[in-house]
Amino acid sequence: MLVTGATGYIGGRLVPRLLEAGHDVGVLVRRADRLRDVPWAASVDVIEGDLADRAAVDRAMDGIEVVYYLVHSMGGKDDFESTELTIARNVAASAREHGVGRIVYLGGLHPATGELSQHLRSRTQVGRILLDSGVPTIVLQAGVIIGSGSTSFEMIRHLTEVLPYMPAPRWVRSFIQPIAVRDVLHYLIRAAEVPPEVNRAFDIGGPDVYRYGQLMNGYAVEAGLPQRPIAALPVLTPWLAGQWVNLVTPIPRRLAVPIIESLQFDCVMREHDIDGVIPPPPEGLLPYRTAVRLALERERAGEVETSWRNAEVEGAPSNPLPSDPDWAGHTAVSYTQLTLPTTSRV
């Protein structure tokens, strides 16, 4: 199996689980030194190269049966859309020529009609290129992913913890169907076993649908914080909202803006056909608040397996240094309420 995006949030969690399942795993990374401190690095075949370089992709594809396509340029350069399409075409053509049996791509939930954001449009086009490659492909379309260290979770967390009152853009009213990272990994792993005649996109999501503002208040309950009064301000554009999120959270604007643009739409499943191809986990899909509770437990215990920082834009001044401890860059807010008794004069 070949995993692209192995240094990212999802890829860094998928690789060790594939190894635990007994698979031979290769990873294609631009810089092998980024795997220096990864515990599973010695157990995989590391190919150094850029996905935009067709020759590097061909080297990585040799002898591969399943390709996991987990890369996207959300935090990259301004021309990320062109770069993403070039990479997708390279992977599609190389996989076809090398006789790969299955491509698994993690895309994003999006509305069936209407104008998409640049970020969602690009991810949709990548999925189409892979589906048209001639290689059996499954596109798993997920919305907000909840797990310790995920960009979406950290954005909800910091907005809720930092602001006692939430003057928010209108997307706080959008309906969201979050999914636990544990369940995303379940679908990714099982997708490799799907019969070759299956070649299509599937929506995936958890059991709950909330407005985005309700996600924040659900987090507040699990974190022991008071629920936040939220006032929607329709005047904030996605760009301005991205600046605002960058100001009050550690999420950089280049990551915040694409997420916010996708939140302009309702991010909910339009179909549940995935159940007929990949059944849910035996214990069921995690409810949102359970996923939040588990994520908080991991963060408080310092057991964050991967973080959005793994895939952050290199060189950002806010990045922790290599010499910093694992917990550097995180924040924790506790809420204490003190009630003073009063006595009447005698």
Language-model features, listed with the residues they occupy:
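Glycine/proline-rich active-site loop of Rossmann-fold NAD(P)-dependent oxidoreductases
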Residues: 147-155, 191-202, 225-228
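Conserved beta-loop-beta element that borders a ligand/cofactor-binding pocket
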Residues: 107, 128-151, 155-158, 162, ...
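Conserved small/polar residues in nucleotide/adenosyl-binding loops
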Residues: 335-342
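Substrate-binding strand-loop-helix patch
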Residues: 175-182, 204-222, 232-243, 283-287, ...
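A hydrophobic C-terminal alpha-helical subdomain
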Residues: 236-329
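Substrate-positioning beta->alpha
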Residues: 151-152, 171-192, 200, 214
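N-terminal Rossmann NAD(P)H-binding glycine-rich loop of SDR-like oxidoreductase domains
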Residues: 1-21
